[in-house]
Amino acid sequence: MNIAFVKYREFKELRDINEAKTKITEAFYLVSTTSLKQKTKQELQLDLSAKKIIISNKSLKTQEIKLPKDLIYYHTYTSNLNSLKLSFTKNGNISKSFSIYIFNRAKKVRYKISFYGFDKSRFLKINNYRKKKNSEITYSNIDEYHKNTNEDREIFYVDWRKE
């Protein structure tokens, strides 16, 4: 294979991952801050099979954000559902913490975005993690890996670097 082609493919993958990370994080912050400012419940729909985010707001028109098509996305909110509808409280918070993993075309995880809803802070917290080059985590074993690293954070920090 041509080295220039391989480097271009790696560059495009990194660009797509950064775009996806930014769009997902900004969409969640937008809905969270809007619900906090307006003191109203807001909704965000995450459709990972169609690779888009839909923001529904009673006072604003529905907004659709398209995610990069070449990547694969997985969330830990519920089991085996590619579509997920989240409601944000009047305080801009979510009821259940969860994560979104971003995979490359080879189905190897490259990025993790964690969303936390806390009663004390009453505001959504988002952490971004970049995969270190240690072990390979694939789409087929991500559910088990996520459960194990939630129980053992030392393993988690061997594989991930917080940004």
Where is each model-derived feature located?
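N-terminal helix-rich module
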Residues: I3, R9, E19-T22, T33, ...
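Interdomain signal-transducing alpha-helical coiled-coil linkers
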Residues: L14-I17
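Short, conserved clusters of charged catalytic residues that mark active-site
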Residues: E26
